[in-house]
């Protein structure tokens, strides 16, 4: 294997090792709202993430999260019925879902878009959104409460734990966590064959070199 080929193999390995991903840092929180109503979610983050973009996304795929709306600085952004606004002074950002439909129910992530060269994954918090028929009531709990159909500015704000890099001590099984496990296993399966191939290539290159050196060290009498 030439030096150029070896460099190509090494670069490929590094690219696989640096593939950015998303990893849940706490067990999911739940919030509920009525069909046709609205709800708001407030996600907190660390001081070091104050100047970074914040996003709200839905994770239907394995290696990527479809961002629904993302901040650009402190200015608010809107995408259809979903809006987001960052409050750097409070180290939090608020996501508002309006005119809820049954299709809005599911798992979402609120997270911080970190530079992938500095951080290998974006810190996120999982949020489970439930939508119930209008006119019905649900019992509120520490991890869930009802939205309202009033203006967004009067909505109760649901505050989740800070978006940090500390793992929750007691994570609970959830589809979002299963996505992360699948991503991790997929990355391992992609990297392992490459590393084994690189190791085999190194051993194969070194084998003829040792053989040629041993021939050079044979006594001259044996060649005659």
Curated annotation (Swiss-Prot):
Q: Which residues cross the membrane?
A: 184-204
Specify the species: Homo sapiens (Human)
Domain Ig-like V-type span(s) in chain numbering: 22-130
**Ranges of compositional bias, category Polar residues:** 136-151
Name the segments for region: Disordered: 136-174
**Ranges of the Cytoplasmic topological domain:** 205-224
Bilayer topology term: Single-pass type I membrane protein
Recall the GO molecular function terms of this protein's record. transmembrane signaling receptor activity
Q: Which domain of life is it from?
A: Eukaryota
What InterPro entries does the record point to?
A: CD300_family_receptors (IPR050671), Ig-like_dom (IPR007110), Ig-like_dom_sf (IPR036179), Ig-like_fold (IPR013783), Ig_sub (IPR003599), Ig_V-set (IPR013106)
Q: What is this protein called?
A: CMRF35-like molecule 6
The keyword Signal appears for this protein:
yes
Q: What is its main location?
A: membrane
PROSITE patterns, from UniProt?
IG_LIKE
Quick one: which gene encodes this? Answer: CD300C
Gene Ontology CC: one annotated term: plasma membrane
Task: Report keywords, A-Z.
Answer: Cell membrane, Disulfide bond, Glycoprotein, Immunity, Membrane, Receptor, Signal, Transmembrane, Transmembrane helix
Coiled-coil ranges from the UniProt annotation: none
CDD domains from the UniProt entry: IgV_pIgR_like
Give GO BP annotations, semicolon-separated. Answer: cellular defense response; immune system process; regulation of innate immune response; signal transduction
Residues in compartment: Extracellular:
21-183
Where does this polypeptide localize? Cell membrane
């Amino acid at each position: 294997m030439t030096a150029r080929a070896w460099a190509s193999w090494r670069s490929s390995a590094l690219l696989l090792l640096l593939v950015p991903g998303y990893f849940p840092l706490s067990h999911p929180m739940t919030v509920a709202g009525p069909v046709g109503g609205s709800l708001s979610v407030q996600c907190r983050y660390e001081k070091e993430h104050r100047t970074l973009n914040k996003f709200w996304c839905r994770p239907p795929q394995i290696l990527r999260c479809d961002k629904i709306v993302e901040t650009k600085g402190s200015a608010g952004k809107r995408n259809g019925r979903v809006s987001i606004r960052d409050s750097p002074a409070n180290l939090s950002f608020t996501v508002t879902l309006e005119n809820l439909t049954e299709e809005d129910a599911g798992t979402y992530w609120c997270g911080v878009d970190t530079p992938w060269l500095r951080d290998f994954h974006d810190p996120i918090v999982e949020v489970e959104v439930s939508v119930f028929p209008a006119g019905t009531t649900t019992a509120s709990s520490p991890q869930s409460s009802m939205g309202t159909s009033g203006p967004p500015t009067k909505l109760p704000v649901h505050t989740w734990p800070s978006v940090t890099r500390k793992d929750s001590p007691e994570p609970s099984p959830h589809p979002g966590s299963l996505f992360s496990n699948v991503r991790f296993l997929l990355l391992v399966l992609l990297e392992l064959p490459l590393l084994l191939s690189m190791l085999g290539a190194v051993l194969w290159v070194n084998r003829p070199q040792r053989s040629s050196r041993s021939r050079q060290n044979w006594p001259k009498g044996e060649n005659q």
